[in-house]
Curated annotation (Swiss-Prot):
It comes from the Bacteria. This is Cysteine--tRNA ligase. GO terms for cellular component: cytosol. It is found in: Cytoplasm. It comes from Prochlorococcus marinus (strain MIT 9215). Zn(2+) binds at C27, C211, H236, E240. Monomer. Belongs to the class-I aminoacyl-tRNA synthetase family. It is an enzyme of class 6 (ligase). It catalyses: tRNA(Cys) + L-cysteine + ATP = L-cysteinyl-tRNA(Cys) + AMP + diphosphate. NCBIfam families: cysS.
Length: 489
């Protein structure tokens, strides 16, 4: 059973899909710049939701759009002396690079607003025909007061709304509107702007109508889950509901899920406040992609995530331990690849281990099924990683270490379970997560120096070299007194 907090009902509800395929729409980025940690949090969280649904045997169709026409894109194009298309296409490529680096599965479909202009115009025409929209000198607006249910998602009282709280609309447009709260469906083109032809003349779509049209075209009138950041609840998602339900006469989405913001010094991380850190900058600073992913999972997805160097370092250390456990097969040099046919293990012991691991998998599913409790899921991951890490400490440092057959079976099955469950969280083993300034030749030289120190019983010097290499992202593995291997962390 999967339970999710529905922003629409303001309570946790049991998830019941409409049909065999779970239809999900996630609001995508406006492609005018590189993505920051706030974007990373949102798309990591929803990637985990998608992965967990698939793990739970649901079929999923996941759609995420690109807003590729917008005031910010036009402004950036002017700054760079380029076109709107050049700016958006360049940043779409960079978006994919960032998301791929974080292990985020690509959506099944990623529609662009500019490819749906005909659908958008048709959608606006329906709203006009039904009396929900009106045109003024080439602009088209949605009449908020025509919709008695407006405000049901955000609990906004339209009588009390601030006139300036209109998303991406300029104040000088208010004079064209019947009411200050009405919002733009179509914007008349300015002399120096790119435009599209429409029944109302040359112009471009408003922000909110783009998503309504793309949801309908990609997934139909009613979808299972609509996703986004909590900053989109109003006005964007509220306006989506108003548009779609007025035009289609059906509920837009059964479940509305929103992730909390990333905060810096108590303020939302955003480009407008200039307090953001891009994903690229974080990774370049030495934070591995999986450490970043792990960091996002440490806090409930609906709560604010406080961005501090200390929290990132703590997440990196925690992930390092899990990553070592995920490297178990590599570090044991194939000794645990399989159980030989001639090696006999009691069925009673096999059943015991199988039951214990099935209980861990059950608790893992219960955690994620409880409104994506990633912290609870991580606790299970730690339970699985601990015996593998403990064994490696012995295996790497004790010469001639012998492996008990039952323990071998347990560790193999434990590793398989760990590998399976970390994939649900999108956590993948990292061999090289950051560039190291130390070369392989330098590593080998220091290892030889350390071996000489150990032979001379200069253990302080040996520890000093180990610590030095560890600071440079190198983990030493003592296979015997004379053989030491290493991995990059």
């Amino acid at each position: 059973m999967i339970k999710l907090f529905n922003t629409l009902s303001k309570r946790v509800e049991v998830f019941k899909p409409i049909d065999d395929v779970v239809k999900i729409y996630c609001c995508g980025v406006t492609v005018y710049d590189l993505c920051h940690l706030g974007h990373a949090r949102s798309y990591i969280v929803w990637d985990i939701l998608r992965r967990f649904l698939i793990y739970s045997d649901f079929k999923v169709k996941y759609v995420q759009n690109f807003t590729d026409i917008d005031d910010k894109i036009l402004k950036r194009a002017k700054e760079e002396s380029s076109s709107m298309k050049e700016v958006s296409e360049k940043n779409i490529i960079e978006f994919h690079k960032d998301m791929d680096s974080l292990g985020i599965m690509r959506p099944d479909s990623m529609p662009k607003a500019t490819n749906h202009i005909c659908n958008i115009c048709s959608f606006i025409t329906i709203l006009e025909d039904k009396g929900y929209a009106y045109s003024r000198d080439g602009d088209v607006y949605y009449s908020v007061f025509k919709n008695k249910n407006y405000g049901k998602l955000s609990n906004q009282n339209i009588q009390e709304q601030n006139i300036n709280q209109q998303g991406r609309m300029a104040n000088d447009e208010n004079s064209k509107k019947l009411n200050p709260q009405d919002f733009a469906l179509w914007k008349k083109a300015k002399d120096d702007e790119p435009f599209f032809d429409s029944p109302w003349g040359k112009g471009r779509p408003g922000w909110h109508i783009e998503c309504s049209a793309m949801v309908k075209d990609e997934l139909g009138d009613t979808i299972d889950i609509h996703l986004g950041g909590s900053d989109l609840i109003f006005p964007h998602h509220e306006n989506e509901i108003a548009q779609s339900e007025a035009a289609n006469g059906k509920k837009l989405a059964n479940y509305w899920l929103h992730n909390g913001m990333v905060n810096v010094n108590g303020q939302k991380m955003s480009k407008s406040l200039k307090n953001f850190t891009t994903i690229r900058e974080l990774i370049k600073s030495g934070i591995s992609p999986m450490s970043l992913r792990y960091f996002v999972m440490t806090v409930n997805y609906r709560k604010p995530l406080d961005f501090t160097e200390e929290a990132l370092r703590s997440a990196s250390e925690a992930w390092k331990n899990i990553n070592i456990a995920l490297s178990f097969m590599d570090l044991t040099k194939g000794a645990f690849r399989y159980i030989d046919k001639n090696e006999s293990i009691e069925e009673e012991y096999k059943e015991k281990i199988s039951f214990e691991l099935s209980q861990k998998k059950l608790k893992f599913s219960e955690a994620l099924g409880n409104d994506l409790n990633t912290a609870g899921a991580i606790a299970i991951i730690y339970d699985l990683a601990k015996p593998l890490k403990n064994f490696l400490n012995q295996f790497q440092r004790v010469e001639g270490f012998k492996i008990d057959l039952n323990e071998k079976f347990f560790l193999i099955e434990n590793f398989k379970t760990l590998e399976k469950l970390t994939k649900v969280l999108g956590l993948e083993k990292e061999v090289l997560v950051k560039e190291s300034k130390i070369t392989e030749e330098e590593i080998s030289s220091l290892i030889n120096e350390r071996l000489k120190a150990k032979k001379g019983k200069n253990y302080a010097k040996a520890d000093e070299i180990r610590n030095l290499l560890n600071e440079k992202g190198i983990e030493l593995i003592d296979q015997s007194k004379e053989i030491t291997t290493w991995i990059r962390l």
